[in-house]
Amino acid sequence: MALAAGLMLSLNSCMDDYDEPNTDGYLITSPESLGEVNYSIAELKNDNASLFSQTNAFEQVKEDKIIEGVVAANDCGGNLYQTLLIRHIDESKPEGDADRDQAIVLGVKHTWLTPYFQLGQRVKVNLKGLYIGCYSKLPKIGQPYYTSSGNLRLGPVLLQLCATNVELVGQPNPDCAECQPIALSPEWLRATANRNYLNYPQLVSVTGTIQEADGEAIFAPESLQDAGYGVDRTLVNSENNTKVTIRTSTQNDIAFTVMPEGEHTYTGLLSYYSNWQIQLRSVSDIQ
């Protein structure tokens, strides 16, 4: 009996050792609060207007500036590589105010971000130590890196910096307002005044017909990929011939999808370089 009791005590002791495993090593975001939000994406853009107006430029943030927003786009479909679209809607500001609905890209160097940053997940980001600026005119939070041609550009932050600079807030809510796209009219897309950093990046939907669709062609065959490993398709609106580029990287589900013929609505991340461009998040963004 004494031996049996001893064995049971030993077994219980071993089980207790494994009841609550230490999972700290599996966390990629801060396990502690970053503090109170003291800044907004709108303030970030307005305070750095000259920086965000450039094509390729960046600077490091030296102070504790904590912003908050919701993940409105991620790499769930494999098309937005190392990219999170962080969007914040300030309901205290009136409809039509440019500062009410602002977004920015947070680049994170990791092969698949979706398990950690699901659509509808609210996050805080402490900008201190990170870099802000533009990559090919796209407003972004990241870190500088050297391209293969030796140019210094704003790339994604290292994954380990998420543990000190990024905090998850609550649970993901994919039905939240920030995950609902803004429907852009042909008139809005044509207006030159809208082609500025306050209007992109953003989650939007556009309607039109893909010029290259023939019932067989797919979005992004490798045979057509450019130096950026992507393929551009042209979406045309029937009302006023407004054109938007749909850019798709190769080697993902969207890339191998046959482009639908006729008029459809496409949802994705909006940017602007020499023309308006959207990148779909997943195949379900085609309606």
Segments (PLM) and residue ranges:
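C-terminal motif of bacterial Sec signal peptides marking the signal peptidase cleavage site
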Residues: 9-13
